[in-house]
């Protein structure tokens, strides 16, 4: 019964009430902050549980009054209202009981890379990045370009954005994977549709305390910054390439105005990539142990197709197809895809958890 699953959370909430009134805890700012955060996270479950138990009691009370000559009709109406509210609240509680992704509230690095398709892939990196920027603006997020490498015919061979905002990772984590585009290039005289692909990686921004990098594991090279077509854009060696020797991961940054800023930005991206690598390894291990696939955007798999001649956008993970590609790209309306994805994975998680 759902009420039995809720009891440990309520017990823990009440226990935290007692702990937080302890003078020793009050004087320990670090512990106080940690425990207060845990209690705040339990607040929604506590409130929903109280309402849930109240509804169950109300249903039982009104059932006993159905035969009452004076209160029977009133009890019938009240019973109907409570029985209508109950399943909605049960679904809400099931979502609250799901394990929280510790990265959900973090800022993200959004990395786009041109794949197969040459110049057309680089152009689509630019188009998709523009659509993501519109999406971030609509949601009230802030963004900045961390690193970019322009394509020879426009667009970008690689582009990394830092997107800041509450819940940025929780929304955009589903964008990680291979995005395929089908359209007629402007240079195509025969009107033939070309297929190209780009990859998107979503990595949470991490605090220094979350991942430790040994300075001896880093190889740092400085070089001349290059712009469109590879030409030099300044006369100082401000571009920085950071190599993490144990993993072979390489980050190049040249968008900052100084070598120091480029080095800091490159190390931030490197930390995010290392953290993301560790998280994926952890998820893969858990997935094998549970023998089920959670899947929040396996970057090796094709997740979405953008077909311009048909004005179609299809997400292959949930078999969702929308014939409004132009509107979605123009206004960054990715919630039309993200919301169904979230609902799908939440339903899957609820089923796997046996709730």
Swiss-Prot record:
Cytoplasm found in the keyword field: yes
Protein name: Peptide chain release factor 1
Region of interest: Disordered: 278-308
PROSITE patterns named in the record: RF_PROK_I
Cell compartment(s), UniProt: Cytoplasm
Residue ranges that the Swiss-Prot or TrEMBL entry lists as coiled coil: none
Lineage, uppermost ranks: Bacteria, Pseudomonadati, Campylobacterota, Epsilonproteobacteria, Campylobacterales
MF GO annotations: translation release factor activity, codon specific
Function: Peptide chain release factor 1 directs the termination of translation in response to the peptide chain termination codons UAG and UAA.
Family: Belongs to the prokaryotic/mitochondrial release factor family.
Gene Ontology CC, one term: cytoplasm
